[in-house]
Amino acid sequence: MRRRPPSRGGRGAARARETRRQPRHRSGRRMAEAISCTLNCSCQSFKPGKINHRQCDQCKHGWVAHALSKLRIPPMYPTSQVEIVQSNVVFDISSLMLYGTQAIPVRLKILLDRLFSVLKQDEVLQILHALDWTLQDYIRGYVLQDASGKVLDHWSIMTSEEEVATLQQFLRFGETKSIVELMAIQEKEEQSIIIPPSTANVDIRAFIESCSHRSSSLPTPVDKGNPSSIHPFENLISNMTFMLPFQFFNPLPPALIGSLPEQYMLEQGHDQSQDPKQEVHGPFPDSSFLTSSSTPFQVEKDQCLNCPDAITKKEDSTHLSDSSSYNIVTKFERTQLSPEAKVKPERNSLGTKKGRVFCTACEKTFYDKGTLKIHYNAVHLKIKHKCTIEGCNMVFSSLRSRNRHSANPNPRLHMPMNRNNRDKDLRNSLNLASSENYKCPGFTVTSPDCRPPPSYPGSGEDSKGQPAFPNIGQNGVLFPNLKTVQPVLPFYRSPATPAEVANTPGILPSLPLLSSSIPEQLISNEMPFDALPKKKSRKSSMPIKIEKEAVEIANEKRHNLSSDEDMPLQVVSEDEQEACSPQSHRVSEEQHVQSGGLGKPFPEGERPCHRESVIESSGAISQTPEQATHNSERETEQTPALIMVPREVEDGGHEHYFTPGMEPQVPFSDYMELQQRLLAGGLFSALSNRGMAFPCLEDSKELEHVGQHALARQIEENRFQCDICKKTFKNACSVKIHHKNMHVKEMHTCTVEGCNATFPSRRSRDRHSSNLNLHQKALSQEALESSEDHFRAAYLLKDVAKEAYQDVAFTQQASQTSVIFKGTSRMGSLVYPITQVHSASLESYNSGPLSEGTILDLSTTSSMKSESSSHSSWDSDGVSEEGTVLMEDSDGNCEGSSLVPGEDEYPICVLMEKADQSLASLPSGLPITCHLCQKTYSNKGTFRAHYKTVHLRQLHKCKVPGCNTMFSSVRSRNRHSQNPNLHKSLASSPSHLQ
């Protein structure tokens, strides 16, 4: 037979392994080891019957009566302590209703679905397969075919008494506790219908019409003191009243509390002179509800709610008779309550005062239980949302609170010692329960005449019929605080494929692969394997809400394509860190290490930067070779400019230089225009407009893909593209759903190299990354290392200029890109070059060294006074209202530099018109990245407004004559100006480009 995946540890796993090794008719023998009967009989081991596997051959008791010896009985007094759902516990409870049966009661299936929704899918499949159920049959609710492939026309199902006993097990879990209690309340509140005694030849139509007529009219008040006027169903000890929470409880919590006649509650105020006799509790008291487990199909007791003369059939365990006699309960024996029922008489008096009931949550009283039920459901019964972090059991009243808590990466918030008091009490109670050696209290269920069988005296009463537990009756029902209801989650969600879902046990080869009743989630779900199961709440599954949010997200993305929370697009970039995030840069270096000669063109599939691989550091996104090839092909079409960026070999820190034979042969006029475009619009703009190629880096044919058609196609493809994994979707709604399912829990690492801080949102990460005060140490180290790294993007243009034209100083290009420059300030702050050009360099570029004294200190990012009315053409896309830009002194000294018109002795000039023309040639939708704050803007106008309002007025020039150092704050400028040691180098000769 086929092998199934090994189940996980625990008692349930051991049972599953045993059932895999044996056929169905022998699986029960393995499970029966050390499973003794809980009734007072000598049976020590369950032995399944040959015909009915749920009946023991030795004692004729049912499977549930034996299996309950291995299950913990929850206490019946009000408590908010619940257990954590575990796979082995769910297996034990599932065996009560699934082992040896072919159909599941509806109420139990609803509750079991809740528990399965907490487990992983493979755990659910293991439980079902171990009990010889398939997922299709479980979803359907009954087995369609037997082991031989025959279509069933009758099914074996657990009896109603066994169902009640199983329902009690669901009180142990917060996911199902409230549902079980509400089921009990609903059943107990069924309106009684007074029907005259039926005759043998009564007409069915007349009977139904009579019932309808009587139920439609207002019934006369029922005399609660007359036992004959009470609905017979309420008199059955086997109903669900045991699951109602009671305030008065026995120190020894009973396992099954029956519904007592209401006159008991009315008489509990009277003095009873008789002393109760000592109660006798066995390991599991006798009960007749477990004696009918051999019935092949038990009629649900709910079918008899409107038929008082038809009570659930009971069969004797000693002989499987076919008796069809039904008993009508018309009389009760008056018995006295135990002393425990007299606890807190002031609370008890509320139940007798005009029939008023009170709510235990807010202590308010109500006219009747119906009003109390409406109040409790509307005020106190709220569906709680559990934290999605595995191992954290915090629950919240709203999705917003839950999501905010789950998105917090602080592990202390999700550790057990910081959970709420309810969970602390739960752990304490579990530890206490495991340490105590207590015996399972029994279920108290009597025969239809409300008297226990002679051979099995019920533990609920002593020999005189006195109740062994307190009961405050119908009017005194108390409601606990139901705080642990979890939203229903589909336990059959993918990661399993439809073939795996349809995988059936070896003994059921004839079942269909997939039934039509299985939801589409089994087929269309695209969620990957994840250690943390994705949980969606009931609210988020509403189509209207999703559609509304999708429209809002789509509109927001159209108007704010590059908001603070978006990843900057690396098309117009200033350095390699801009072209590729630090994470992707490191990944690409590890995956694409060059082993060939220096200056070798990058082979296909080994581009120095893949936008597809720009991922967050915490996201474990890996690419298969096929995906990598596909991504590299897409990069050839979409980002041809990025292939121009060379990268150094990882090992040894050696540098690549262009060989003499591979120097670019570019006409000087074209070179000058290319340089201007590099200064004004970036590398991508220059190449896309000129179509020039550097033979040392890539063949010129690669650049033929760059054009308006390619740009339009790129923009169209990127319209609905995920900013993190770069996958393209058909619409904005698909992008939103993909981002929520795939990336909502990813952490975002700081983009500053050397800083490993992580944040739950891109907006927080960008705010942190733009604060240079937090990165002075990392930036100082990076600035020192940059002098040895010639192939950082900061020095790419300078090196290209030196190799192409040794006699032309590429001063402006090297400085206008505003990248990390050699040198730091006294405080170790990051410095940027500021350029000036003599009036003679308006039309041509004069050769001259770069002044190391001309630096810009951006050590702080606080707001500045408006001392500057100019900015570089590269920074502002070549447009400035004042017509001034930051230039560099052509003769190398530090005199006469100013950002304010009129202060400089040299005319202010730059390639304003040409830069503006180059920017005008850019596509309108092409994003632009600000080189100072790393924010991305959707178009030139937005970026221009940002630069004017944020960065243009933040530059403060040193007050010392001849020092052109610029600062982003007055405080830093004053501190620099007052330090005479920093201005001794004004007389030193400037250094030349190396």
Swiss-Prot record:
<keyword id="KW-0597">Phosphoprotein</keyword>
<dbReference type="GO" id="GO:0030154">
    <property type="term" value="P:cell differentiation"/>
</dbReference>
<dbReference type="InterPro" id="IPR036236">
    <property type="entry name" value="Znf_C2H2_sf"/>
</dbReference>
<feature type="short sequence motif" description="Nuclear localization signal">
    <location>
        <begin position="533"/>
        <end position="539"/>
    </location>
</feature>
<dbReference type="GO" id="GO:0005730">
    <property type="term" value="C:nucleolus"/>
</dbReference>
<dbReference type="InterPro" id="IPR040436">
    <property type="entry name" value="Disconnected-like"/>
</dbReference>
<comment type="subunit">
    <text>Interacts with HSF2BP (via C-terminus).</text>
</comment>
<feature type="compositionally biased region" description="Basic and acidic residues">
    <location>
        <begin position="603"/>
        <end position="614"/>
    </location>
</feature>
<protein>
    <recommendedName>
        <fullName>Zinc finger protein basonuclin-1</fullName>
    </recommendedName>
</protein>
<keyword id="KW-0744">Spermatogenesis</keyword>
<keyword id="KW-0221">Differentiation</keyword>
<dbReference type="GO" id="GO:0008284">
    <property type="term" value="P:positive regulation of cell population proliferation"/>
</dbReference>
<feature type="compositionally biased region" description="Polar residues">
    <location>
        <begin position="615"/>
        <end position="630"/>
    </location>
</feature>
<dbReference type="Pfam" id="PF12874">
    <property type="entry name" value="zf-met"/>
</dbReference>
<feature type="modified residue" description="Phosphoserine">
    <location>
        <position position="541"/>
    </location>
</feature>
<feature type="zinc finger region" description="C2H2-type 4">
    <location>
        <begin position="748"/>
        <end position="775"/>
    </location>
</feature>
<feature type="compositionally biased region" description="Low complexity">
    <location>
        <begin position="859"/>
        <end position="877"/>
    </location>
</feature>
<feature type="region of interest" description="Disordered">
    <location>
        <begin position="970"/>
        <end position="994"/>
    </location>
</feature>
<keyword id="KW-0238">DNA-binding</keyword>
<dbReference type="GO" id="GO:0006356">
    <property type="term" value="P:regulation of transcription by RNA polymerase I"/>
</dbReference>
<keyword id="KW-0225">Disease variant</keyword>
<feature type="modified residue" description="Phosphoserine">
    <location>
        <position position="537"/>
    </location>
</feature>
<dbReference type="GO" id="GO:0005737">
    <property type="term" value="C:cytoplasm"/>
</dbReference>
<feature type="zinc finger region" description="C2H2-type 1">
    <location>
        <begin position="357"/>
        <end position="380"/>
    </location>
</feature>
<dbReference type="GO" id="GO:0045943">
    <property type="term" value="P:positive regulation of transcription by RNA polymerase I"/>
</dbReference>
<feature type="region of interest" description="Hydrophobic">
    <location>
        <begin position="240"/>
        <end position="249"/>
    </location>
</feature>
<feature type="region of interest" description="Disordered">
    <location>
        <begin position="1"/>
        <end position="29"/>
    </location>
</feature>
<dbReference type="GO" id="GO:0005634">
    <property type="term" value="C:nucleus"/>
</dbReference>
<keyword id="KW-0539">Nucleus</keyword>
<keyword id="KW-0862">Zinc</keyword>
<feature type="compositionally biased region" description="Acidic residues">
    <location>
        <begin position="563"/>
        <end position="578"/>
    </location>
</feature>
<feature type="region of interest" description="Disordered">
    <location>
        <begin position="444"/>
        <end position="472"/>
    </location>
</feature>
<dbReference type="GO" id="GO:0000182">
    <property type="term" value="F:rDNA binding"/>
</dbReference>
<feature type="zinc finger region" description="C2H2-type 2">
    <location>
        <begin position="385"/>
        <end position="414"/>
    </location>
</feature>
<dbReference type="GO" id="GO:0008270">
    <property type="term" value="F:zinc ion binding"/>
</dbReference>
<dbReference type="GO" id="GO:0001216">
    <property type="term" value="F:DNA-binding transcription activator activity"/>
</dbReference>
<dbReference type="Pfam" id="PF00096">
    <property type="entry name" value="zf-C2H2"/>
</dbReference>
<dbReference type="GO" id="GO:1900195">
    <property type="term" value="P:positive regulation of oocyte maturation"/>
</dbReference>
<keyword id="KW-0805">Transcription regulation</keyword>
<feature type="region of interest" description="Disordered">
    <location>
        <begin position="555"/>
        <end position="639"/>
    </location>
</feature>
<dbReference type="GO" id="GO:0007283">
    <property type="term" value="P:spermatogenesis"/>
</dbReference>
<comment type="function">
    <text>Transcriptional activator. It is likely involved in the regulation of keratinocytes terminal differentiation in squamous epithelia and hair follicles. Required for the maintenance of spermatogenesis. It is involved in the positive regulation of oocyte maturation, probably acting through the control of BMP15 levels and regulation of AKT signaling cascade. May also play a role in the early development of embryos.</text>
</comment>
